[in-house]
A protein has these predicted regions:
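Short "lid" loop at the C-terminus of a central beta-strand within the Rossmann-like core
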Residues: 168-171, 197-201
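Class I S-adenosylmethionine-dependent transferase superfamily signal
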Residues: 182-183, 230
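Short, glycine-/aromatic-enriched active-site segment of Class I SAM-dependent methyltransferases
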Residues: 199-216
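A short SAM/SAH-binding and catalytic strip from SAM-dependent methyltransferases
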Residues: 141-142, 151-176
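Rossmann-like AdoMet
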Residues: 1-139, 144-145, 149-157, 183, ...
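Short alpha-helix
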Residues: 217-242
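Conserved beta-strand signature within the Rossmann-like core of class I S-adenosyl-L-methionine
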Residues: 162-165, 178-179, 186-197
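Core SAM-dependent methyltransferase catalytic element
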Residues: 239, 244-269
Length: 269
């Protein structure tokens, strides 16, 4: 079995097949957060989403700020020194390893995505501190076995891990199953940080439009659905809240409030 896992996780990252005529989740999100790694089809799709839901740019900004705060909390307050970032997206400012290694340069990070475009950008742009490490794993967010086997090359899975699932579970139909299997696989003392667009009427039209445009459907969820992901885990205060309410930092004072994103962090007891 170990040899089979090694073969599965040591395969080279797939060559990026880029279809610039079809909107891509990572590239559309890259446009929404002000990035330049996108094509005309992505920009047009993003503009259609903004037309349907003018809150979309604020959603993107709030999501990145939540990522920064959760990683900072895990590194600075919870003492986590290794991270598993699933559904990485195209790198931009304030990536997980940058935030974590600003607290402790020895932090180790594994980025996971199954989009070859994302992985090619990650290889080119994500650079660790000399004291720490970053690696990049080609795996689906639902494939817990492949994720854990691949992560074990860089992370010590006998020690707690900070699992980051931000901007990914909304593209997973059976998110509860994916979260549950990952929570079962990581060591006691590990943390899980998640974000999920809520069933807000401002996003409903945008979700319908996105599902007409793209091959990867998006799923909106309510607080009760998100709460079920944390069965058996200890939620960290303030629990499941709109992301701007999750331990806001002074530098977030100008961020918009009431963005329809739910966020939470929990610890495995």
């Amino acid at each position: 079995m170990a040899e089979e896992w090694l073969k599965a996780t040591s395969r080279p990252i797939r060559a990026a097949h880029v279809d610039s005529a079809v909107p891509n989740v990572a590239r559309v999100w890259n446009y929404l957060i002000g990035g330049r790694d996108n094509f005309e089809a992505d920009r047009q799709a993003a503009k259609q989403l903004i037309a349907a839901a003018p809150v979309m740019p604020q959603v993107a900004v709030a999501s990145r700020a939540f990522l920064r705060r959760t990683v900072s909390y895990l590194a600075a307050e919870a003492g986590i020194r290794q991270f598993l970032d699933i559904g990485t997206g195209i790198p931009t400012a304030g990536n997980t390893h940058e935030v974590a290694q600003a607290v402790d340069p020895s932090c180790r990070i594994v980025y996971v995505d199954n989009d070859p475009v994302v992985l090619s950008h990650a290889r080119a742009l994500l650079r660790s501190s000399d004291e720490g490490a970053t690696s990049y794993l080609d795996a689906d967010a639902r494939d817990t076995q492949a994720i854990m086997a691949g992560a074990s090359v860089t992370l010590d899975l006998a020690r707690p891990v900070g699992v980051i699932m931000i901007d990914v579970l909304n593209f997973v139909e059976d998110a509860a199953d994916a979260v549950g299997r990952l929570a079962a696989a990581v060591p006691v003392g590990s943390y899980l940080a998640v974000m999920q667009p809520s069933r807000d009427e401002r996003l409903a039209v945008a979700a319908i439009r996105w599902n007409q445009l793209a091959a990867t459907p998006v799923f909106l969820r309510d607080r009760d659905q998100v709460a079920r992901w944390f069965a058996g885990l200890d939620l960290i205060d303030p629990g499941i809240v709109e992301v701007h309410r999750w331990r806001p930092a002074p530098e977030d004072a100008e961020l918009p409030e009431g963005v329809p994103l739910l966020g939470a962090v929990a610890r495995k007891p």
